Amino acid sequence: MGDKLSAKNLMTEAGVPTLPAIEITDKLDVLKAADEIGYPVLVKASAGGGGRGMRIVETQEGLEAAVEGAKREALNSFGDDTVFLEKWLDVSRHVEIQILGDTHGNLVHCFERECSIQRRHQKIIEEAPSPAVTEDIRERMGAAAIAAAKKLGYSSAGTVEFLLSGDEFWFLEVNARLQVEHPVTEEIIGKDLVREQIRVAEGEALSFNQEELSIEGHAIEARLYAENPEKNFLPSPGPVIAWEPSTIGRARFDSGVETGSIITTEFDPMIAKVTVHAPTRREAAARLARVLETTRIQGLTTNRDFLVNTL
């Protein structure tokens, strides 16, 4: 499922809604293909991830340069310059369904996460459940995710990602792994997804079924980065002079940083992901903002103020 184009083709076979797309080859008339799909279009790396190898194109004039730029970035980042054209939705939400499967034929979905707050096509605030998903959408999207997993014969933890516009949704990609934002799902369903993933790898059956899952409250996660929002979120590496996670709000901190650590240019500049759970979305947002404000971090320029203002 690391190949996004192959994944789209499989999802079409499974009856999962997909956006129009076509692989860019040497024989393809790219300008004609984009006209057929309809602008705006997205040039997208098939082996991509993390927002790399992607270009939004509004008009024909910028298409060829965008294709070449995406191919170069894809080759440098993934060792594969395969790119494709896909219809771009100007107004949409990034909503994903957490799935779990075992080797005994059991499959469940753990409801949705909203991941629309992004910069440079990378998520920075995630929440569950999505404020835009009705019970009807949740049921249909969950069924589509299960259909996708069945088509793949999937076991272990994974994510089926969709674009949502109004009450319609389209397949985006499958992430065949546990994602950074999985804690928000754990918080609202009260299950340990890492534990289930390990149990499945050991040949055990899932410890719960679909009927035993329900949504309790609201969870939000923020990604605290060493970066400068005023300079287009440019990474800001350097020493961590002081790091003291807040002790209020019963927040969950996932981090490998401590006082004295060095944030380098060789790796992603994430300092921590911070997750809170509360009875309502409003309470969760306020609680997370307060947790971030009362976390002590010195020596680095961070996106903390941006996160607090966004919340």
Which ranges hold each PLM region?
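Short, well-ordered beta-strand elements within core beta-sheets of diverse protein domains
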Residues: 54-56, 87, 133, 270-279, ...
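A short N-terminal helical cap/helix-turn-helix that marks the beginning
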Residues: 201, 290-311
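N-terminal beta-alpha lobe that positions the nucleotide/phosphoryl donor
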Residues: 1-160, 164-181
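Cofactor-binding beta-sheet edge motifs in enzyme active sites
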Residues: 150, 260-276
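Channel- or pocket-lining gating/hinge segments that regulate access to a cavity or pore
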Residues: 283-286
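Glycine-rich active-site loop/lid that clamps phosphate-bearing ligands
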Residues: 211-267
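Active-site "cap" helix and flanking loop/linker of ATP-utilizing ligase/carboxylase catalytic domains
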Residues: 133-167, 175-230, 309
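Acidic/polar loop patches that form or flank catalytic/metal-binding clefts of enzymes
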Residues: 18-20, 157-158, 204-210, 231-235, ...
